[in-house]
């Protein structure tokens, strides 16, 4: 009887864990930060009238993706001129706005490129607290039950040059954010309880971008990046994966100590979130000459320059690399033994994740900034013109559905239960059978 009871308790606990993961979408790209969901029963087809439970207009201009915890949805927004930065909470069941709270006034906003907005970083959420950042203009933690601001920071200086894009992530007692500006480049961990700085680590790459007068080329534009960190367990240890301009870094997330890095100086302006599977780190390298790389993680202290031959005996290496159809803004998605990506111009590709062999490439049409979602054997690709193309994730290309909503997507999808939450440029939609 005791063994049976323990087994039953264990099964209930595992079932509850699965349900929690299905219901909560706690950060950019979901519970694992890789755009995959364990949910089943998501709709295949929809329109403005079919399989729509509700839709709610969202004021301002913002590309942040929604996060979900329990019965709440949180997202950020900003006025078009960037002078007012706000956070919103919606009721998941009804779509009604619970809180619409202006957090920061900005007297002199930095420039934001048309591909960007003044509220592009997505929040991070856990039980009782939500964390939002707008980059240098401000970072804050709010109580999700009262909407009260628990702490905020406005003292972090960084010239985002074309706008901030790096979303915060949670790990243990830390909130971790990339700051890759034209003037300074670093990764920073906040104590999530107090907002105080736990550690700060400057990027270590020599950009080699000084002209003959010692001035930084292009006003530091090539030092910019917009990526979001990822936590991976590598050889039994937690590793913080952080893509900066011209280099992929691995850090100890507890201390910020750099473990290894891969340098690629021919590219710049990367905006993807790295992922880890099959013992490999997958990332792309941004504008100019973008690569999709599968990196074999290295030992502490190892450095690899992609343009040079790896030192003999070094563990850190490029397992495979391609320049074909590599996205600059949308992040790749690993599903089983396959990796999928759509480039900014609408060509989707599938490769074998372990070898880089191309399985298929097909034009979906439109332009893409949102990262794909993988769930229940399908991939959902949302473009800037408002179309979502659904294809199988088994390695055989077929357009299962093509759905359209007005105004287009810059934000990536979120999932809770059997519902899709899609943020267009003007509204948030709950799509459900």
What are these regions (language model features)?
Residues 7-15:
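Bacterial N-terminal signal peptides
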């Amino acid at each position: 009887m005791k063994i049976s009871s323990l087994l039953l308790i264990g099964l209930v606990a595992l079932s509850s864990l699965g349900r929690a993961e299905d219901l909560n979408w706690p950060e950019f790209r979901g519970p694992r930060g890789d755009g995959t969901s364990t949910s089943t029963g998501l709709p295949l087809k929809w329109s403005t009238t079919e399989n729509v439970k509700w839709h709610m207009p969202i004021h301002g201009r913002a590309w942040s993706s929604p996060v979900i915890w329990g019965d709440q949805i949180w997202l950020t927004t900003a006025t078009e001129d960037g002078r007012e930065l706000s956070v919103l909470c919606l009721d998941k069941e009804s779509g009604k706005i619970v809180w619409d709270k202006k957090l920061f006034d900005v007297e002199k906003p930095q420039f934001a490129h048309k591909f960007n907005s003044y509220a592009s970083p997505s929040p991070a959420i856990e039980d009782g607290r939500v964390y939002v950042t707008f980059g240098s203009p401000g970072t804050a933690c709010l109580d999700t039950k009262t909407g009260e601001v628990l702490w905020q920071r406005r003292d972090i200086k960084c010239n985002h040059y074309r706008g901030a894009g790096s979303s915060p992530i949670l790990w243990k007692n830390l909130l971790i954010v990339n700051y890759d500006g034209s003037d300074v480049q670093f990764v920073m961990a906040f104590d999530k309880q107090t907002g105080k700085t736990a550690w700060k680590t400057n990027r270590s790459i020599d950009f080699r971008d000084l002209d003959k007068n010692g001035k930084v080329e292009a006003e530091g534009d090539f030092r910019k990046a917009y990526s979001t960190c990822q936590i991976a367990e590598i050889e039994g240890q937690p590793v913080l994966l952080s893509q900066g301009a011209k280099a992929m870094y691995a850090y100890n997330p507890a201390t910020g100590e750099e473990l290894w890095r891969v340098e690629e100086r021919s590219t710049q302006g990367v905006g993807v979130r790295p992922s880890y599977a099959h013992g490999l780190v997958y990332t792309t390298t941004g504008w100019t000459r973008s690569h999709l790389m599968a990196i074999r993680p290295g030992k502490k202290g190892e450095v690899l320059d992609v343009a040079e031959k790896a030192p003999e005996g070094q563990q850190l290496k490029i397992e495979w690399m391609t320049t074909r159809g590599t996205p600059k803004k949308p992040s790749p998605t690993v599903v089983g033994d396959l990796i999928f990506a759509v480039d900014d111009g609408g060509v989707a590709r599938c490769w074998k994740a372990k070898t880089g062999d191309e399985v298929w490439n097909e034009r979906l049409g439109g332009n893409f900034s949102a990262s794909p979602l993988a769930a229940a054997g399908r991939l959902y690709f949302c473009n800037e013109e408002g179309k979502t193309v659904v294809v199988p994730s088994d390695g055989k290309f077929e357009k299962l559905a093509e759905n359209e909503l007005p105004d287009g997507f810059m934000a990536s999808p979120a999932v809770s239960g059997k519902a899709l939450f899609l943020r267009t440029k003007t509204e948030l939609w709950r799509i459900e059978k």
